[in-house]
């Protein structure tokens, strides 16, 4: 059994020789418990099927895109390793039609949940793309000693490895092509045996995050437990209570929802039961937030519940990978600190100690798929990638101020820092959930719209009362001029990475006939004449936004 002599398979074999059969992936959805020997055997079997079925040599196969039609699972991990073994690039088909339009996949690897579905049948009938089933715990597993590394087959670090898509928060998702070096850079320290770490991964996290996360955990000798919980956060809490999980990655939305489950359900249980859940939350060594900034009330809740130990903040992007890591002090800060640069990451700011964050890292994208001009435009003359994020340097750490285009908008000639206004709104004691949105108005460019959910014991909240309460925190021009209160069943539209889908949210909650007349009577509006009564011409920091 011959494998490429690259860092990925070298590391897998190193751990497998010391811990061949110990469970490294516990897939609760497929009821599969597998060790490194199972992973290698299934991946090698699938890699050989790929070569045989395509009737081409490995070098030709290696130039192809191979689709993966499977949720995050043991199967998707096997598929990923098989694709890497033949030197091809994997592409998730979670957005099937869009992905197939963007890349010419030569084959699709299909998980058991999709093999008999209408989607898989249509895929083969309408596209003619070869479809292969992903093996699970194949019989005839050989001893680990039978695997060898082919020193004459070392893939280039820059060989395409996988295709991801951006979240689509501000527009159509973009195909981001990454090289093998993206993975190589993430496990530079070799681990020779299985550790006692156990990471819980559930299906609400976006596919690209899970893809990287599962592979990296097993390459680091860390066990992975996979769940299809369908946003059943009460079940995640129950798993916390068992005091076995040591690592978990959540988006800010998930940390918020977990907080609400504790406050509304768990906290009302008998005290011994409550303490059992608290011990479980404190047992986790590395709770991580990624994909956004935690609101201060959420950050404070977890800090208190975990006895002064904060949720760890990391920052990165689909295009650039992990860029900064916050230490405990920065993670606990009420500022939107994203910490300091991760290893092997070089940064600079466009305006000295503030401005757009520009980075160099081995994890940077190869290219935007089918977009050479866009790819060229996202690098400066020195080869730094333009993240589009505005930050400010404070000592060794960076403070996140928002996305250059998505988190700042114009109100007349003024710059509205959406995240800052949202943070102030969230801090009001009667606000449970808060969103600040730009609603277009030809007379002033954009209105500042507040979309909020109230705490259960507060009902008499108006636009004027909110503006009054914000008056000590914000200048007049940053205060909301539109308000809509979310009802019990109202849910804010989100992308697959759990970020707020801004355009859809505005369309759903602020539909209108014209500038001052909205289609829903529950929207409270401050008329343009009332706005003009305020002095909006005071000393301001004016910047060119676009």
UniProtKB/Swiss-Prot annotation:
Enzyme's top EC category? ligase
Question: Is Ligase a UniProt keyword of this protein?
Answer: yes
Task: List GO molecular-function terms, semicolon-separated.
Answer: ATP binding; medium-chain fatty acid-CoA ligase activity
Enzyme Commission designation: 6.2.-.-
Q: Which Gene3D superfamilies match?
A: 3.30.300.30, N-terminal domain of ligase-like
The residues the entry assigns to the signal sequence are none
Provide the residue positions that the database annotates as binding CoA: 412-414, 482-484
**Biochemical pathway:** Secondary metabolite biosynthesis
User: Out of the domains of life, which is the source?
Assistant: Eukaryota
Q: Which UniProt keywords apply?
A: ATP-binding, Ligase, Nucleotide-binding
The entry's ATP-binding residues are: 166-174, 300-305, 403, 499
Q: Name one GO biological process term.
A: fatty acid metabolic process
**Any idea what job this protein has?**
Acyl-CoA ligase; part of the gene cluster that mediates the biosynthesis of oryzines, natural products with an unusual maleidride backbone. The two subunits of the fungal fatty acid synthase oryfasA and oryfasB probably form octenoic acid. This fatty acid is most likely activated by the acyl-CoA ligase oryP to give octenyl-CoA before the citrate synthase-like protein oryE catalyzes condensation with oxaloacetate to form tricarboxylic acid.
Q: Which family does it belong to?
A: Belongs to the ATP-dependent AMP-binding enzyme family.
Record-given protein name: Acyl-CoA ligase oryP
